[in-house]
């Protein structure tokens, strides 16, 4: 079942056409990678999907409903969550409080005083932390976390509204190889655990680390110059001569398959 259907998405900034009519679909239970050189249009696409900017032309349908014109908050409340290259967490709060704040937002109660929020759905927050292996550190300040654990916390926050679509913007940036594999293996496990449920999870992620892309993506989209130049299985994309030329300027193997496949 298609969770997300993007059709003929276009966007220009001044005289620069950042996106030139890209179209793709994302299915429930799928991990879809979006790759491309800097300036290919990946960030522009993500920013349109979660309502940060509006396309000049095209449609974005989520669960059969248009997302056009919705704010990031409205998009989030529809069931679209996003993690960022630079984690969006509150360093002075505990891990549990970070997740509780997301739960408040999911229940349309951000107006509540923080004194109330410290007790609001604490048990539920602990369970989201358990999903990412951080429940034992629930009362630790976020500032005390190692970087890889901050990314896990951000994942727990993103899951707080039980999304059907998770957008992950370079989730493993700045991580060591083992940390990258651990985070993506966790993400894949979360997706698979939700597959049998009515509210299954689909993931769209951008990534520069090709071992992550080829190790964890079910399908891959390749952008270059604002156009979708290739899509398919990791192996199909790896063997695509146009993709090889875009990345390496010649007809040679693109990348070796990564770990975690």
Question: What are the residue ranges of the model-derived segments?
Answer:
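Glycine-rich phosphate-binding loops of nucleotide-dependent enzymes
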Residues: 2-261
